[in-house]
Amino acid sequence: MTVLVVGVGNIFLGDDGFGVEVAHRLSTKDLPDHVRVVDYGIRGMHLAYDLVGADHDLTIMVDATQRGDPPGTVYVIELDLPEPADTGGPAPLLDAHGMQPDVVMGLIAVLGGEPGRVLLVGCEPASLDHRMSLSPVVEAAVDTAVRVVTGLVGSYPFGTDEELTCALASLAK
């Protein structure tokens, strides 16, 4: 059983550096040997290619992702590959300097990959301005995300959606 935790984001765009900061903090933690933490930064295409032939049982992506929640909200979403009908057209718009998790998953599908189970630990950004620091509310959410990721790693494997829901509920306490 292997778990890959990936920090995604651009440290030059304020809160977009959230995933990178979480990965850096996780790299200082004493995690089980089967867990690998990698800062992918803006190398979304590299991440997609690494996940195409993934030998990981679980990948946890950590990224700032806009969902319309209050800034600093941390959430966990299970990501799925798009349906084949959704990838029959042209390849998704690619930006070699950064890709949202859904675009990474779309590229994996276009390439015919099977990434295994993929979770997104996301945080609602407050500001994506050109600066090299997180906003105070997102900075405060980094510790929450670290706790969520370590909790997910500690409770894995969870085979069913119900077990994942229970793991997430226990983290909320």
What are these regions (language model features)?
Residues 1-114, 120-123, 132-143, 152-173:
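N-terminal catalytic or cofactor-binding beta/alpha core of small enzyme domains
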Residues 149:
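Hydrophobic "lid"/C-terminal helical patch
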Residues 128-129:
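Short, solvent-exposed loop/turn segments at secondary-structure junctions
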